[in-house]
């Protein structure tokens, strides 16, 4: 909080990212003192369960999914009830988050359980429309069963017995076996339409206006795809210039867009190749960066923002971040991640 302690200050609540698989509010990069000191606002955050601990969904009341989002909801409830004691105004709360945190922010806009807990929202690099931000029920159930098998719990018996077995498994064992499914820009556990916190598919809510209609800001960075490409795409490494070949480019498309067929690979390849600068050594690298970033982060953010902008009487803002800091720890070619 600012010093001296204000009265009726705006409140900003941060929700960290991490693919719904990891993260913590205590990272130095999330230190809210700088915003509080320079802008005179109250900055709050919370930890929430991630991975299987936060998003295991087996389709019953014992493992319904979205526990991590419910953690966030509980924190928002506490903040609304208590922030006045810290100099904040409960009627001036803005929630903001990055990546999975941005997707979380959009889910709070969509959920009737959260809509009265804040006033405005900022989504940085993603939304609930991101392909990794929502799992179909059947796929979420399959992944939960695979995890149960991996930690030695039988899935042949009643599902309640399986869950009871998993409760006896050490947390470290659970976390060590969570990556039962892997794909570039894909995460094993994520939110589901549970009929409680998330009551319908996000696209339905956006089409019907069945969500909190308020002022929002959406944005993204210039090179959203690079960070994930460095963790598994063919030919990518932070220790090289990652000047990939055409074959590696095509393979990267298949990894970035899961389940894509060959015709779609060819279409995307043609669309993203820079035909004007075709002879540039970095051309294929930059093309897959743009494709992966568009598919996983930029287009979902813009689509969500466009839908919000269609509601009368509300303001929607958009930004694109293109500045690379002088102390940026990654190679210069990685751009603005």
Curated annotation (Swiss-Prot):
Signal peptide: none annotated. It comes from Branchiostoma lanceolatum. It catalyses: an acylcholine + H2O = a carboxylate + choline + H(+). Disulfide bonds join 153-165. SUPFAM superfamilies: alpha/beta-Hydrolases. The active site is at residues 99, 224. The keyword Zinc does not apply. Its EC number is 3.1.1.8. GO terms for biological process: acetylcholine catabolic process; choline metabolic process. InterPro entries: AB_hydrolase_fold, AChE-related_enzymes, CarbesteraseB, Carboxylesterase_B_AS, Cholinesterase. GO terms for cellular component: extracellular space; plasma membrane. Keywords: Disulfide bond, Glycoprotein, Hydrolase, Serine esterase. This is Cholinesterase 2. GO terms for molecular function: acetylcholinesterase activity. Glycans are attached at residue 290. Belongs to the type-B carboxylesterase/lipase family.
């Amino acid at each position: 909080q600012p010093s001296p302690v204000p009265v009726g200050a705006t409140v900003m609540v941060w929700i960290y990212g991490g693919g719904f698989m990891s993260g913590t509010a205590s990272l130095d990069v999330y230190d809210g003192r700088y915003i509080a000191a320079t802008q005179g606002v109250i900055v709050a955050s919370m930890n929430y369960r991630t991975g299987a601990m936060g998003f295991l969904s087996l389709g019953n009341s014992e493992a319904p999914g979205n526990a991590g989002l419910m953690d966030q909801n509980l924190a928002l409830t506490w903040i609304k009830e208590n922030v006045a004691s810290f100099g904040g105004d409960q009627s001036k709360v803005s929630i903001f988050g990055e990546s999975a945190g941005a997707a979380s922010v959009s889910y709070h806009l969509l959920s009737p359980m959260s809509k009265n807990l804040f006033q405005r929202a900022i989504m940085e690099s993603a939304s609930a429309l991101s392909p990794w931000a929502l799992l179909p029920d059947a796929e979420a159930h399959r992944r939960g069963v695979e995890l149960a098998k991996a930690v030695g719990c039988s899935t042949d018996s009643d599902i309640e017995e399986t869950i009871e077995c998993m409760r006896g498994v050490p947390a470290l064992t659970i976390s060590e076996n969570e990556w039962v499914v892997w794909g570039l820009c894909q995460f094993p556990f994520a939110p589901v339409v549970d009929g409680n916190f998330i009551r319908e598919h996000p696209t339905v809510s956006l089409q019907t206006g069945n969500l909190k209609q308020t002022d929002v800001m959406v944005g993204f960075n210039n090179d959203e795809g690079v960070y994930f490409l460095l963790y598994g795409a063919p030919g990518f490494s932070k220790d090289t210039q990652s000047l990939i070949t055409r074959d590696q480019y095509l393979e990267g498309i298949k990894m970035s867009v899961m389940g894509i067929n060959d015709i779609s690979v060819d279409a995307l390849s043609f669309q993203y190749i820079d035909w004007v600068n075709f002879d540039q050594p970095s051309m294929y690298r930059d093309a897959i960066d743009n494709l992966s970033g568009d598919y996983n982060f930029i287009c979902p953010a813009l689509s969500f923002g466009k839908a919000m902008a269609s509601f009368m009487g509300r303001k929607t803002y958009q930004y694109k971040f293109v500045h690379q800091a002088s102390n940026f720890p990654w190679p210069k070619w990685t751009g603005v991640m």
